[in-house]
Swiss-Prot record:
It comes from Conus magus (Magical cone). Its cofactor is Ca(2+). It catalyses: a 1,2-diacyl-sn-glycero-3-phosphocholine + H2O = a 1-acyl-sn-glycero-3-phosphocholine + a fatty acid + H(+). It comes from the Eukaryota. This is Conodipine-M alpha chain. InterPro entries: PLipase_A2_dom_sf. It is found in: Secreted. One of its GO terms (cellular component) is extracellular region. Heterodimer: conodipine-M catalyzes the calcium-dependent hydrolysis of the 2-acyl groups in 3-sn-phosphoglycerides. This activity may be supported by the alpha chain. Conodipine-M inhibits the binding of isradipine (a ligand specific for L-type calcium channel) to L-type calcium channels. Expressed by the venom duct.
Amino acid sequence: QXPSTAELCKINSNACSVPFSXIPCQKXFLAACDRHDTCYHCGKHFGFKQDDCDDAFFRDMTALCAHGTDDEGXCPX
């Protein structure tokens, strides 16, 4: 049995499209980046436009950044 498109989308999402490696708090953003990659690669199958993906990514990142950093400026755990 061939894997479904949804299963392939999960397999192929690894946030590898992050353009540079020195992003502060990169691990804290990994899930949001994975969702954005998945949306870009597979969104058409589910009826999403790239603008929808970008809007969702903006909301995800805004929510993550709202938590801020600790007193030493370190990323949230």
